[in-house]
């Protein structure tokens, strides 16, 4: 893992040295003037500049979790998150949304785990566009269920596939995409995301047009990214790529920020290009209790505990107070979990990919 020195600020752009050891050249701090040119500054880590090959790296997109949510998730926004199905759910970002008391949000996701339930329970959500909301380990999500029963939440039912189509249409810049997927189901009843059409090539062929979705912001969790937002991710993508490309703004939360050379060394794993990204947040264990392949496994006990401790509104409020409001940030959250619990979630059986040669 990279070792980070203290950040330095020069003008309006921050820089810091990232030392990845002998295989990667260290990155040195610099200043940037109004014309975007770089000038090497004094090293803030002794010996880090003793190399013929220096790299400049802009920190303009790097944010704390607090600042990223404050800047890019306004009240009333439509927010796509949890797009990778049951893994890499951006819980840390969701908890920061709760801490900042965001209101009137529209939550967008496929089969959506307990993060949606927490956001609903905290009063952040006004609408939900999803295929399912619940606790993947236990079934029902009590805050969501109660809100629906009391007509306190507007819900638009989707399937995983029709949600993918809606986001893909948004990414393509077209108003809809056709499908046969929802034919003969109740998914479309009272749902303005579906409109019956007929094929222009086979006039008697009935189809459903799925309305495009363009989230105001998409939040994703990945294994690693550079400071410009170019992100490596492996494992189940779910509908993450569609959600990123359809969004007006994108926040990438990464387990670690690495040098650009690390990202460019494996271009096929760079599934999110930096030009789509507005903010990059480094947040270790930011997806807990969901798993991140290669970093940590699912905390099954946490899902069981959440199920047992949130059956009633007053119990849910206590849980949110204990795990969100009274926890200053993700580091405090991890400390509350405890070292033993974190260590127990470490990768037990590594499954390394074969090395690829990109040479000619």
Where do the model's predicted regions map?
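Conserved alpha/beta enzyme-core scaffold
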Residues: 58-360
């Amino acid at each position: 893992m990279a070792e980070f020195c203290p950040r330095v600020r020069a003008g309006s752009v921050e820089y810091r040295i990232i030392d990845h050891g002998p295989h990667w050249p260290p990155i040195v701090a610099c200043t940037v003037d109004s014309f975007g040119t770089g000038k090497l500054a004094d090293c803030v880590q002794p010996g880090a500049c003793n190399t013929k090959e220096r790299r400049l790296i802009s920190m303009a997109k790097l944010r704390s979790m607090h600042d990223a949510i404050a800047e890019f998730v306004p009240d009333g926004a439509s927010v796509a998150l949890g797009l990778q199905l049951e893994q890499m759910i951006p819980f840390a970002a969701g908890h920061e949304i709760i801490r900042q008391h965001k209101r009137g949000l529209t939550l967008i996701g496929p089969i959506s785990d307990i993060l949606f339930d927490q956001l609903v329970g905290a009063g952040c959500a006004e609408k939900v566009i999803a295929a399912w909301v619940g606790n993947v380990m236990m079934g029902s999500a009590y805050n969501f269920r109660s809100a629906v029963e009391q007509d306190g939440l507007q819900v638009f039912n989707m399937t995983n596939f029709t949600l993918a189509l809606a986001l893909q249409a948004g990414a393509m810049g077209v108003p809809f995409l056709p499908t046969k997927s929802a034919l003969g189901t109740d998914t479309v009843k009272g749902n303005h995301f579906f409109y019956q059409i007929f094929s222009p090539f086979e006039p008697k062929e009935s189809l459903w047009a799925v309305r495009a979705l363009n989230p105001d912001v998409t939040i994703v969790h990945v294994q690693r990214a550079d400071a410009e937002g170019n992100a490596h991710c492996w494992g189940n993508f779910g509908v993450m790529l569609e959600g990123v490309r359809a969004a007006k703004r994108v926040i990438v939360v990464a387990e670690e920020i690495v040098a650009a050379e690390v990202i460019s060394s494996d271009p096929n794993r760079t599934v999110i290009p930096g030009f789509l990204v507005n903010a990059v947040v480094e947040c270790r264990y930011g997806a807990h209790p969901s798993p991140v392949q290669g970093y940590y496994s699912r905390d099954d006990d946490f899902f069981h505990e959440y199920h047992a401790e949130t059956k009633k509104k007053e119990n849910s409020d206590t849980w949110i107070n204990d795990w969100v409001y009274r926890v200053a940030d993700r580091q405090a959250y991890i400390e509350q979990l405890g070292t033993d619990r974190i260590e127990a979630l470490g990768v037990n059986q590594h499954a390394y990919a074969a090395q690829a040669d990109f040479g000619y």
